[in-house]
Swiss-Prot record:
NCBIfam families: uS13_bact. Part of the 30S ribosomal subunit. Forms a loose heterodimer with protein S19. Forms two bridges to the 50S subunit in the 70S ribosome. Residues 94-118 are annotated as: Disordered. GO terms for cellular component: cytosol; small ribosomal subunit. The keyword Chaperone does not apply. Gene3D superfamilies: 1.10.8.50, 30s ribosomal protein s13, domain 2 (4.10.910.10). Coiled coil: none annotated. It comes from Thiobacillus denitrificans (strain ATCC 25259 / T1). Belongs to the universal ribosomal protein uS13 family. It comes from the Bacteria. This is Small ribosomal subunit protein uS13.
Amino acid sequence: MARIAGVNIPNHQHAVIALTAIYGIGRTTSGKICEAAGIAQTSKIKDLSEAEMERLREGVSKFTVEGDLRREVTMNIKRLMDLGCYRGFRHRKGLPVRGQRTRTNARTRKGPRKAIKK
């Protein structure tokens, strides 16, 4: 298994798919990284030379990924909560943030139903 950005990349997958194992890199970004590195998207990770792997590592290092990205997202949410704005309040209460209805259909965000005590 190859390691890029502290993540073990699966050897048997195509390069464009294998790069999506890194948090913060999806299909579009991985395609751009492969294109910039001059690697065919259909080539498998196990078939790449060490020089090609190094070009992939350089391409990935230009993006904010893994721990840094997780920390950045967490800090953005914390900042909203500290500001006391509407979005921060919704995060704090564990409710949908982007205007969805909550009378019904908010179970994912609200969690399991709580029984009403009589």
